[in-house]
Amino acid sequence: MSAIAHFVASFREAAPYIQYLRGKTMVVGVTDSLLEGETLIRLAADLNLLASLGLRLVLVHGSRHLLDKLASGRNFVPKYSGSRRITDEATLMEVKQVAGIIRSDVEAALFSSVSAPQRSKPPVIACGNFITARPLGVIDGVDMGYTGTVRKIDAEEIRLRLDGGAVVLISPLGHSYSGKTFNLSMCETAQEVAMALQAEKLVFLTEEAGIRRADGSLANTLSVGEVQELIHDNPDAPADLLHAAVGALENGVSRVQILNGREDGSLLRELFTREGSGTSIAREPFVSIRQARSDDIPHIIALIRPLAEQ
């Protein structure tokens, strides 16, 4: 197939997906190790392309990678309870610093990755105090300090920014009614934002190709039930990520995708091709086989009637 023929075929394949996703809200959670260098530049270009096609984008970034680098620089070993970082006052200051660094880098990348035919001007990046948080408190006898959990998402204010054509950028930080700031989980934050907005899609960009089954094979599709079995059966499964996916799907989000964000074009392939990329998770099985029931008989007859009449 020639290059032109391949382009035409690919564009025809993508067209229905482009039409369907126009005007839909998509929340993208990104591990912060992807938000640097060439990977950030490529990702920013793809996000700008999606915005130009009419998707309403909310980007939630992580902070663990850069926080670990800062801790290493001061010879400090981070403390965890399970998968959650224990946030003392010194760490909280670094959390705020990291959020500012990442936000600035992402804004600059989105601003500079616009190509002239695509947009007349760079996208507006909207940030704000959209998240109300509360402390996690004491878990299994461990005081989590300034590590928090989401109390409320100001969905109305986020929608106002999206209605105005902005790309919304959210850091994993939340503030309490008493004026304290808390360090949040990126997975939980992205999940809660997607639920509050009733997003069409929640996409997690990670360092992995997707979710692997217990035997090591890549799962292209999973249902909520299969994810819950995987969490139970596979101790190496990314539980925080999968719990966020299940929580989102059980509360109105249509689809969750988990992709390798370092792979060039993985987000576009997942959204606009039949084959997709990574792992796609839905509430119900993509294909299920069961014993026929008596109430299936009319549908079975309707299926075989054209063959019987030939």
Locate each region found by the language model.
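Charged, low-complexity C-terminal accessory regions
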Residues: 106-107, 276-280, 306
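Nucleotide/pyrophosphate-binding catalytic subdomain
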Residues: 1-255, 259-262, 293-299, 304
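Conserved GNAT-fold acetyl-CoA-binding loop/helix
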Residues: 304-310
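Active-site catalytic pocket residues across diverse enzymes, especially alpha/beta-hydrolases
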Residues: 71-74, 271, 275
